[in-house]
């Protein structure tokens, strides 16, 4: 992917507008989870070091477009940044007709979703964003699959449009895993439904040497192999699709499972052979033999893409399968990339964040890239780089 990178540009004295992903949870005016801001800090610091007159914007929550709503203000983010940065930081509410910024200063432009035309990407709004800056930096991979005013429109009209370090890193990592994977490549796809991951499974079946399915998705494949899945989450209408994928791709069939009688934190767990599942069983995890077989596959891989847990890891009695997979990824010398909300929660639970080569910050954007879809905000940067 050929895009201009912020790291390669001279930003001294230039008005720089960064579209970041600062969509963080806020309670009582305080940021309660700072992961996305922490991920953006290196971009902010680098731009300031380069002498930029720096502006940054983001969406936060889902306000009614075109209306100011204090509940969705970026003020808590501004207060957080004041504690983390040594430069002046202030919030600008009305900025579309221009904003004064000094070199070495950071001005946070209020929630871009307060601006009418943001979601529809109106040309009028896009041109107003573009007029604010000499250089536009797209650094919000999590919103790269949306063609909105602050992600796409501004990049059409800004004098220079480039990728920030976070976005560039994400594209490099995804490219390494998806476009030129070192082989063998193993893709692990978990989650509850085949239907929501069907295009992901079809796309990966063409790229991966081994496709591993887990979670509710695996139940549909177990049923497709002719086994009883009891009361488990299973999409019986997609059994033929699962059979077709299993025939075309190397998908290891689960040999043992962990079952319970109901979906609850206190339900006892029982390990069973996949052929012993009864009508009142619910499959909540892969069994130890299957987990070990998958761990061996992972240990022999050169590239690993992980999206989705293989069991109900939130309940400890059904977490072992996901834990074994997570630890195998952590111990594997392969290049590994992980993405998706549940996957990140599993990585946190099992404490392997520093052992995964790259953790993707984008949920929907990550999946759309894996599906082989064009991300509009990346496509416009490529177009501008050619020009």
UniProtKB/Swiss-Prot annotation:
From the Swiss-Prot or TrEMBL record, state where the protein is found: Cytoplasm
User: Which residue windows are transmembrane per the record?
Assistant: none
**EC top class, in one word?**
transferase
Residue sites binding ATP per the record: 197, 314, 340-343
Part of which pathway? Carbohydrate degradation; glycolysis; pyruvate from D-glyceraldehyde 3-phosphate: step 2/5
- Pfam families assigned: PGK (PF00162)
Substrates-to-products reaction catalysed: (2R)-3-phosphoglycerate + ATP = (2R)-3-phospho-glyceroyl phosphate + ADP
Example GO biological process: glycolytic process
- GO cellular component labels: cytosol
Instruction: Indicate where this protein is primarily found.
Output: cytoplasm
Which positions bind substrate?
21-23, 36, 59-62, 113, 146
Family membership: Belongs to the phosphoglycerate kinase family.
SUBUNIT field:
Monomer.
Name of the protein this chain belongs to: Phosphoglycerate kinase
């Amino acid at each position: 992917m050929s895009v201009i990178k912020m790291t390669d540009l001279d930003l001294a004295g230039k008005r720089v507008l960064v579209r970041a992903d600062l969509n963080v949870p806020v309670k009582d005016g305080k940021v309660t989870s700072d992961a996305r801001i922490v991920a953006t800090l290196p971009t902010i610091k680098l731009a300031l070091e380069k002498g930029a007159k720096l502006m940054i914007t983001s969406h936060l929550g889902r306000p009614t477009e075109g209306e100011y709503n204090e509940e969705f203000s970026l003020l808590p983010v501004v207060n957080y940044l004041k504690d983390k940065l040594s430069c002046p930081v202030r919030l600008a509410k009305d900025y579309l007709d221009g904003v004064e910024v000094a070199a070495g200063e950071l001005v946070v432009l209020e929630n871009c979703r307060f601006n009418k035309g943001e979601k529809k990407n109106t040309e009028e709004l896009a041109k107003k964003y573009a007029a604010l800056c000499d250089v536009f930096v797209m650094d919000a991979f999590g919103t790269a699959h949306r063609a909105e005013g602050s992600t796409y429109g501004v990049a059409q009209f800004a004098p220079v449009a480039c990728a920030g370090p976070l976005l560039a890193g994400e594209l490099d990592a995804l490219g390494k895993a998806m476009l030129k994977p070192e082989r063998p490549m193993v893709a692990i796809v978990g989650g509850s439904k085949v239907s929501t991951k069907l295009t992901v499974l079809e796309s990966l079946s063409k790229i991966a040497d081994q496709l591993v399915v887990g979670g509710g998705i695996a139940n549909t494949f177990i049923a497709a192999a002719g086994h009883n899945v009891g009361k488990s989450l299973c999409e019986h209408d997609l059994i033929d699709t699962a059979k077709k994928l299993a025939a075309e791709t190397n998908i290891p069939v689960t040999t043992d499972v962990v079952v319970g009688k109901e979906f609850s934190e206190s339900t006892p767990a029982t390990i069973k052979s996949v052929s012993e599942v009864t009508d009142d069983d619910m499959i909540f995890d892969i069994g130890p033999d299957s987990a070990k077989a998958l761990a061996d596959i992972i240990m022999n891989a050169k590239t690993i893409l992980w999206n989705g847990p293989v069991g109900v890891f939130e309940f400890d009695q059904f977490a072992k399968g996901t834990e074994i997979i997570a630890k195998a990824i952590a111990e594997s010398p392969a290049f590994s990339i992980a993405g998706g909300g549940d996957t990140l929660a599993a990585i946190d639970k099992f404490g392997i964040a520093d052992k995964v080569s790259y953790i993707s910050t984008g949920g929907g954007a990550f999946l759309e890239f894996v599906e082989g879809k064009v991300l509009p905000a990346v496509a416009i940067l490529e177009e501008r780089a050619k020009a």
